[in-house]
């Protein structure tokens, strides 16, 4: 399959640069995978699509204030974007204006440049930085000097709404540099209404890295190598999934990150033994992949030629997905992180679809 197969023309006017003030009032497209039928609703109507006995699984990662600035020993300014917290005092990060930064280089951060960091390793395009601080940990330092990084296509200044609305209401475990955006549409009243309906709700953790915004640079998508991200799926979640399916309930994943975490766990030895799955994953899901767990997926409208739209195609079917996206454009849905949402059910025939463009 070629990268261009997943291209489409998106008017810039449909890119959302600001969040919905009331989370659950965004628009919702519903598409049933087995029929391709489409319905237009609001996100709070999603309660009508989910049944008592179903299990919703959300990604409880929390976005860290991963973007901050520092000075090189020469006085030159650098911008740091944390990719991963490696330990108590160590981070993995990309550095803008990284010319002449090598192993052993010193970078100074914070008020009056009192926080010193040393580059102790270089890994591909990332640098490992060690903070020389006997009091604060790396996460404490980041919380003190950093700011929440909005997606790179949003060029405006951040505001107080972003601090709140670019996090989910159920955030718990710090580590992402980008929000699990499908979850942004849930507010506490909606979660309570789902619970009162008899819907079970549980959580996994996948810390989203900068690779989620990186373009595919291969003509043939099968040659693409995914970035690696940290994932945790607890033994209790695995047991709940097995029990739910045994009773005839459905598994509903909120976000592509949740689906990828579950599929990664499924292919591990921990799944059959119902043990905690804690690992890194670089699973790449594209058309032809056979899904094993999720019956319905809640997701946003994604970038052309992205790994995310490829995952949606694998779940919903290529023709269904392209029809849904064309319908979204005609009906002026909002796209990307702050945009509108889809609720899609699994098309079991998708892996066998005749992929002819």
Swiss-Prot record:
EC number per UniProt: 2.4.99.17
SUPFAM superfamilies per the UniProt record, alphabetical: QueA-like
Stated family: Belongs to the QueA family.
Known catalytic reactions: 7-aminomethyl-7-carbaguanosine(34) in tRNA + S-adenosyl-L-methionine = epoxyqueuosine(34) in tRNA + adenine + L-methionine + 2 H(+)
GO biological process: queuosine biosynthetic process; tRNA wobble guanine modification
Pathway where it operates: tRNA modification; tRNA-queuosine biosynthesis
Known function: Transfers and isomerizes the ribose moiety from AdoMet to the 7-aminomethyl group of 7-deazaguanine (preQ1-tRNA) to give epoxyqueuosine (oQ-tRNA).
Cellular component, GO annotation: cytoplasm
The encoding gene: queA
Enzyme class label: transferase
Protein name according to UniProt: S-adenosylmethionine:tRNA ribosyltransferase-isomerase
Disulfide bonds: none
Source organism (scientific name): Buchnera aphidicola subsp. Acyrthosiphon pisum (strain Tuc7)
